[in-house]
Amino acid sequence: METKGYHSLPEGLDMERRWGQVSQTVEHSSLGSTERTDENNYMEIVNVSCVSGAIPNNSTQGSSKEKHELLPCLQQDNNRPGILTSDIKTELESKELSATVAESMGLYMDSVRDADYSYEQQNQQRSMSPAKIYQNVEQLVKFYKENGHRPSTLSCVNRPLRSFMSDSGSSVNGGVMRAIVKSPIMCHEKSPSVCSPLNMTSSVCSPAGINSVSSTTASFGSFPVHSPITQGTPLTCSPNVENRGSRSHSPAHASNVGSPLSSPLSSMKSSISSPPSHCSVKSPVSSPNNVTLRSSVSSPANINNSRCSVSSPSNTNNRSTLSSPAASTVGSICSPVNNAFSYTASGTSAGSSTSRDVVPSPDTQEKGAQEVLFPKTEEVESAISNGVTGQLNIVQYIKPEPDGAFSSSCLGGNSKINSDSPFSVPIKQESTKHSCSGTSFKGNPTVNPFPFMDGSYFSFMDDKDYYSLSGILGPPVPGFDGNCEGSGFPVGIKQEPDDGSYYPEASIPSSAIVGVNSGGQSFHYRIGAQGTISLSRSARDQSFQHLSSFPPVNTLVESWKSHGDLSSRRSDGYPVLEYIPENVSSSTLRSVSTGSSRPSKICLVCGDEASGCHYGVVTCGSCKVFFKRAVEGQHNYLCAGRNDCIIDKIRRKNCPACRLQKCLQAGMNLGARKSKKLGKLKGIHEEQPQQQQPPPPPPPPQSPEEGTTYIAPAKEPSVNTALVPQLSTISRALTPSPAMILENIEPEVVYAGYDNSKPDTAENLLSTLNRLAGKQMIQVVKWAKVLPGFKNLPLEDQITLIQYSWMCLSSFALSWRSYKHTNSQFLYFAPDLVFNEEKMHQSAMYELCQGMHQISLQFIRLQLTFEEYTIMKVLLLLSTVPKDGLKSQAAFEEMRTNYIKELRKMVTKCPNNSGQSWQRFYQLTKLLDSMHDLVNDLLEFCFYTFRESQALKVEFPAMLVEIISDQLPKVESGNAKPLYFHRK
């Protein structure tokens, strides 16, 4: 009883994986019929090309038994290498091997017949008669029986040949029959090592009706070359290559192999076919969806290398089908002379594309052969994720061995990536570094797309800040462009047009702040770190919007200020009502202003749902209570980690130190609540005098005849009598006081951009402080520009005053922020940069930090108000002048005197200072004098770090470079003169 071995692998699966795992050697051996048992008779199927008339089309039960006896065993050995000898054998020995091929084909037909699969015939094949073919096979079998069987080796012109046979499977009844190629044929001298794929036969059917494709065997000269090629058309050999040992079919030599039990016209079960037949062969190689046609012939002229099937003997790590002795690189078919072979890879999304390459070979030219044309057809029908990946531009590099040459090719713009490639290891795909997406790229990328990262410390004027003192105070700097778009990208990258068409500001109604305008169009918004709602605009429209001193009444307010009623009246963004009825209560107006369309808010500290604006920041109730208790209780929290704990809804109670730091960074301060209460009280006091004013006198009678006095109704007042006094009263009420103006023009808090991931070294902290000071100075200059009376001074005097007082203004503002946000416990440089005792030591300026901290403690002792702070800040701007005086000294003295009087009025108006106004005024002016001593020490340290900036690795922004460069020689020469209120 005959035993057939089957491997239970699904059809069409695991084929290409096994193709890449073919063993590196093949052992050719022939076993006698006496040594063969039924257990050794595996279903060994080979897909080879046969000479015309050499393979039978019909077979019988009796002849199949003879074929079992004649079948030699060509066994793969994956463990030990089998190197063929280089002795040239006789032609008879090669015929014996051919007989082995014929017998194995007979076994193949028996197995196919037993499987009893029905294969659909697509085209009628031109064939010989089955009886004639079978007769030829019987003659060959008898001839081989007479000569016996003995092991034979294959050699080619004294060159060792190492064949890598692929292990293909043909699924029968759910199993897989192993197929081993057993046709080593003699190489004729006229057949050079380089041969065109004209000899390669194929069993690929037409794409319309193909069910499965068998692994083909291509004849390389007279060698069988195995690769997963599926050539669409079997072509004849070139004239210079002898076809004597070839197993390739031309259309004239086509033969059909079929089952003796079925008609050749109904079921074709041969793995070899000519182009007219297009027979369907059941094989687990691939389905029509993953058929990949690979050309496997190239020459040194070709430098396009995509798929390889052959490697040299020294390259034992590459999986291939046939190697040439001298071929040391990866190629499909290598000549003994050539060192690098490749072939073009063309895989279009539509189907197959044909390219013709002229491949000259050194050997063929010596033999008198001319150029050989190789038509190569490749087809890729499966792309990555079943999607078209055109314009992908992937370079496929075949990694060579150390002793081999390297050749690579770049696929075309329409190439796809074949995800079913059998070469799982040797081929490495990398994206092109200069991919141009199928078009010619002519853009020159910028050398440094981020010009602000320059390491030079004295080239700031051209790098970071485009503002200067004269540019901000005087006319705008020509050529300044706040929009940085396109500066860091090459020309070839497509950029979206920034025409502002999505957010036309002229057509945005005031109600757009809630998210949807009256037309139903939605707008994007975001809530910033301090509760700022800002619409999405272009970069050029957003430049320094928070610095506009006097915004129009009808514009949208972008910040929720914490000073008085300004935030409650303007932050809603609704249009101003022209007429408010007297009977409408304030609660009704409040409910109207807070509509249901207001976007939901989240806590800026922990991310929980916010309950309102607490201490100047939109937070939840939990963070509100925590901040109040932490600041008023003066708790000194310490972090167990690195002061970078995650604060969210779940973990906000884990680390109170980091939670308090995040509250401070968000901008929470106790002064916001106090200023709000003061604003309400101020509004009540302003309403009482207006109610006590007597009504205007009645107008005189219209005519002298009337004895009674006629009072005109309120809706129709007399122009000459009633309207003029009312307008004068309104004009006086609408005239803003200097304190109100200073409150409105106060700059917003600036973020330092501190990176917590970097170590807290002295150079990092000082560089961060300098960058923060540069940002703050831009705001200071803009603040001084709109300061009442400051614009009346000449431009040179304005610049001089700012250069002399910039350090004093910065340190005074720092003390105020520390007093307002941290109750003078820390130094509040910025929301993201708060100095504790540890950072004061790390900054190498601990004593200076303690001096600024003492000023902040004086604010607590004096309970300084915001109105007093703003006026004292203006006096500090006017507290240092040159020794020679200013150009307009009289205007300067007048301006300074007016602000001193305003401070005196502010102290007198304060109800808490009744009877002690002069004493408080003395304390405030004494505090201003103490600022000069602190500033002298700060300037000395600043000038030292400025000189040694390169050695200390401390960065200075452009604004500070301009100010310090002009101030340093004047201060060191003694030209600066501080103005004191009290003699020392």
UniProtKB/Swiss-Prot annotation:
Phosphorylated. GO terms for biological process: positive regulation of non-canonical NF-kappaB signal transduction. GO terms for cellular component: endoplasmic reticulum membrane; nucleoplasm; receptor complex. It is found in: Cytoplasm; Nucleus; Endoplasmic reticulum membrane. SUPFAM superfamilies: Glucocorticoid receptor-like (DNA-binding domain), Nuclear receptor ligand-binding domain. Keywords: Cytoplasm, DNA-binding, Endoplasmic reticulum, Lipid-binding, Membrane, Metal-binding, Nucleus, Phosphoprotein, Receptor, Steroid-binding, Transcription, Transcription regulation, Zinc, Zinc-finger. Residues 692-703 have a biased composition (Pro residues). Residues 603-668 bind DNA. The modification Phosphoserine is found at S250, S259, S283, S287, S299. This is Mineralocorticoid receptor. It comes from Aotus nancymaae. The gene is NR3C2.
